[in-house]
Amino acid sequence: MRIDIITCLPKLLDSFFGHSILKRAQEKGIAEVVVHDLRTYTLFKHKQVDDYSYGGSAGMVLMVEPIDRCITALKAEREYDAVIYMTPDGKTFDQQTANRFSLYKNIIILCGHYKGVDERARQAFITHEISIGDYVLSGGELAAAVVSDALIRLIPGVLSDETSALTDSFQDSLLAPAVYTRPADYKGMIVPEILLSGNEKEIEKWRFENALERTKERRPDLYQKFTKAYDADGK
């Protein structure tokens, strides 16, 4: 997978992709993340990429021309499966979306900034508008990093234990169950006995029931979604 991130603040992303799983994925050649400075695609002398909004509303707007020039240049080199715009008014990013996007070969992510981007850029180039939550950040860089991380870790060969990603929270619309490691008894706080039994069938049953209870308690919206799907399947 190749992810091209377009931003007017590239240094914000310098360190994020240089560590841990994301770094190893790139070293293995499994994933490639390329950050593009939008300012290199402007024709203005002082590298301006934003301007005042027509109509006089507050806040600056990213101009369509440098976005056009950057995306057009990238598309001249390869085909892209998706051009994603990170924006608070986009569709909320979830695990199912991550699963789907992780199958793509090439992706462009455009980071919003200031008051957003010229609507004409959205209409002409964007295939998916994505939000990571109902709140506003200073720019789309952190959101782009979140999406990139979620996609890359799903690619086969990235995680040392590939089953780990399949048992994460939200993969089956449930939160992940509680997990424990050594020691079995820490200051009187004891690991559930069933997890030490070696009985895989009973352990799996405990994990499902624990995940179900945690989801019901912490995310009733997900619990309701799961039970509806569960009932619809006749289980």
From Swiss-Prot:
Its EC number is 2.1.1.228. Specifically methylates guanosine-37 in various tRNAs. The keyword Transferase applies. S-adenosyl-L-methionine binds at residues 112, 132-137. One of its GO terms (biological process) is tRNA N1-guanine methylation. GO terms for molecular function: tRNA (guanine(37)-N1)-methyltransferase activity. The gene is trmD. Keywords: Cytoplasm, Methyltransferase, S-adenosyl-L-methionine, Transferase, tRNA processing. It is found in: Cytoplasm. This is tRNA (guanine-N(1)-)-methyltransferase. It comes from Cytophaga hutchinsonii (strain ATCC 33406 / DSM 1761 / CIP 103989 / NBRC 15051 / NCIMB 9469 / D465). Transmembrane segments: none annotated. Belongs to the RNA methyltransferase TrmD family.
